[in-house]
Amino acid sequence: MSETTPNNTSNNNNNNNNNNNNNNNNNNNNNNNNNNNNNNNNNNHNNNNNTNNNNIDTFSQKASNDIVKPILPVTEDLQNSTKEMFTKVSSYIKSELATTVSDYNLLIQMNNITSSKYQDMTNVTKGLSVFMGDLKIKYEEFQPYFDKINELDKNVTDLEKTVQLLDEYTKRLEQKVKNIDKSSLLPTKQIQPPQPIPQQQPAQPAQPTQPTQPAQQPSQVSTETKPQENIENK
């Protein structure tokens, strides 16, 4: 019994080793298969890239055949021309920027002046509104005086009409007085006494006749009553 036990253990170890070797072989086979698959994928990818590159080459060839390539100048001349163009463009842009900045500053100054003028006009407008309010108050205060002045103007107009009537009446009265003076200067005729009629009875002595008075009393009466009538009519 003691001899069979080591043999069994050795057999078992051998079997285990064989199994391990088999597993390793299987793993190696799997790795090889994976490597082959990766190689195949890489080959396919390379084939695709080559196909794309071939397509790009064909497209570039077609484009080069269709478009005429310009004849480029010498590299040094191209650099000089590019430098000159860059200098001119930069100077142009700088001048445009300077002009824009000056215009912007001018606009700022104009805006400031406009705002100051607007503020001044606002202050003037406020002053004018206050002044107009004061004038309105003064006009309301003077309104009673204006009413009195209008009333006095109306009364003066009526008085002027009355004075005009009195002036006309005075002129007519003066004319009548002149006429009366002229009539008083004329010689009056003497009235002869009547002849006595022979009668049986003795005639009584005739009474002396009184001189006739000038005809100015009726005119005086008419002139004295006329102003009263005019005044009453008024």
From Swiss-Prot:
Repeat listed as a keyword: no
Keyword annotations from UniProtKB, A to Z: Coiled coil, Cytoplasm, Cytoskeleton, Lysosome, Membrane
Molecular functions (GO terms): gamma-tubulin binding
Family: Belongs to the BLOC1S2 family.
Record protein name field: Biogenesis of lysosome-related organelles complex 1 subunit 2
Region (Disordered): 1-58, 184-234
Predominant subcellular localization, coarse grouping: cytoplasm
Oligomeric form and interacting partners: Component of the biogenesis of lysosome-related organelles complex 1 (BLOC-1).
Localization terms from the record: Cytoplasm, Cytoskeleton, Microtubule organizing center, Centrosome; Lysosome membrane
GO CC, any one term: centrosome
Coiled coil (residue ranges): 145-184
Record field: compositional bias (Low complexity): 7-55, 200-218
UniProt function note: Component of the BLOC-1 complex, a complex that is required for normal biogenesis of lysosome-related organelles (LRO). May also participate in the coupling of lysosomes to microtubule plus-end-directed kinesin motor. May also play a role in intracellular vesicle trafficking.
GO biological process: endosomal transport; lysosome localization
Position of the signal peptide: none
